[in-house]
Amino acid sequence: MLTRVLFALVLAVASIPAWAEDAKVLALGLADHEVTQEELDKGTALAAPRFNTPAIAYTSIANLKKGDVVEIMLVNDDRPLLHSTETLAEDQAIYLLQAGKRGVPAGGWPEGSYHAALTVTRDAKPLIEQSSPPIPFD
């Protein structure tokens, strides 16, 4: 009897489609340029922003569903500076979202520690809230 129950459980789990998996963060961080999914897939270290370079907060997320709301922010200490928000029109196996500035603010970036902050909302409830480690812009 137990064998039949375990077999039925294995069949039920195996039949769940891939899109039903939980959303998960594949990458979250800061770079000195707009990143591509190919760069993130390679896993090579990305150049960190400095006070006199562009600064882009990025995230790559897997298994998002239609209607999910994804927000990425470039944050200095506790002050959000720039953000990008997208409501997905369809399911996404992998989704890349970025926010930042391709240029450099006059006089450079303000002093402080910067990080990327991510929020994913599903059905009006927070699903993921995560931040990258803070880095100073030297």
Locate each region found by the language model.
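Short edge beta-strand/loop segments characteristic of extracellular beta-sandwich folds
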Residues: 56-62, 73
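A short tyrosine-centered beta-strand micro-motif
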Residues: 110-121
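Conserved aromatic beta-strand anchor motif in extracellular beta-sandwich/beta-rich domains
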Residues: 72-76, 120
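Short, compositionally biased P/S/T/A/G/V-rich stretches that sit at domain boundaries
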Residues: 18-55, 138
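Solvent-exposed serine/threonine-rich low-complexity stretches and specific carbohydrate-binding patches
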Residues: 80-93
